[in-house]
Amino acid sequence: MTWRAAASTCAALLILLWALTTEGDLKVEMMAGGTQITPLNDNVTIFCNIFYSQPLNITSMGITWFWKSLTFDKEVKVFEFFGDHQEAFRPGAIVSPWRLKSGDASLRLPGIQLEEAGEYRCEVVVTPLKAQGTVQLEVVASPASRLLLDQVGMKENEDKYMCESSGFYPEAINITWEKQTQKFPHPIEISEDVITGPTIKNMDGTFNVTSCLKLNSSQEDPGTVYQCVVRHASLHTPLRSNFTLTAARHSLSETEKTDNFSIHWWPISFIGVGLVLLIVLIPWKKICNKSSSAYTPLKCILKHWNSFDTQTLKKEHLIFFCTRAWPSYQLQDGEAWPPEGSVNINTIQQLDVFCRQEGKWSEVPYVQAFFALRDNPDLCQCCRIDPALLTVTSGKSIDDNSTKSEKQTPREHSDAVPDAPILPVSPIWEPPPATTSTTPVLSSQPPTLLLPLQ
């Protein structure tokens, strides 16, 4: 009896030891480092590997995937698999049964979106054991970059180059300008005359930003290579867009300026006297009322900001769009956006169409503000906006047979972009007909699109 009791006790201990050993053999491993990064709209596979001391029988095990967003501290079930039952709570979510047999419980999610970033938890049950692991998923979007040359309103020998980066996420981005000369072939960062605007959020959650570089070509060496360098979390290497400065535009010497002045000073003097007499003949009261009360469309909107539906808009964004971004856009029907704003219905409509076609959805609400101003005659009268501007439907004359400027779509940049020439672009607007408006006349020089060579 004693021998049999001892044998039974030994067998029980062996069974208990085997059970304890088995429970410790189930383990789940996720992505190394605890963070997985994936591009926007990609078909992502979130890794989850099962390690078990025994061969896996998928008919007697279960897999459940959970997701917790970055903004809400609540888990949501994404996918579950138990025996012959599987259900996807997120469209397209799947765990391959065939791979599960070899211990691969990875979750596949097609077309991942920005809002799906967060913590994912893989829970594995092999009765009576359970193991789990978590991973942080980050969704990023790479910026698309292009260069524009904007000469509107610039002085002689001055150029403004705009580097637009769009469609990136997360918001943090770094844009710098560099130059390389024949004397100094290594890139030198430029810190002066560089203005980078605010980041603008698009409707899809991505961001846009524009950085401007102002150059005085007469003070720079021809052949100097300039680069707009974009650094972002989604890029393995910086995104570079290049252009080469050509020969500086002709600048008169002091002798030439003196000679030209001596030749033409008599006509200029007569013109000056005529202007003075004209000003004297105009009633002083009319000049006073006109100059003291008239507002440009942009200033009118800013002054009466609360009269518009601007709860989600910002004044500094409107100023940046109206004075810097919109004047560089190539609009159809020969229209160009003036930096002081416009109540010309055709100009506003063409700007609205351009922003929608180019996917600049964050700018559309700001365009609507000028529609609202035009549709408010009392406010236009209060700001003393010229009524003639409200009746103008196009900036072109009836006899203008010039062809419409074709919209140019920039080619997509690679990480390293070679030198890009400045391509000529046909004029995108003509001076408006003469009116009594006090609106300043803009330069007819259009912005030039810089396309990097592939």
UniProtKB/Swiss-Prot annotation:
GO BP: NK T cell activation
One Pfam family per UniProt: C1-set
GO MF terms held by the record: receptor ligand activity
Extracellular-side positions: 25-262
Secretion signal, residue range per the UniProt entry: 1-24
Limits of the Ig-like C1-type domain: 143-244
Self-association state and partner proteins as the record states: Monomer. Interacts specifically with NCR3, but not with other natural killer cell-activating receptors, including NCR1, NCR2 and KLRK1.
Name the UniProt record assigns to this protein: Natural cytotoxicity triggering receptor 3 ligand 1
Organism: Homo sapiens
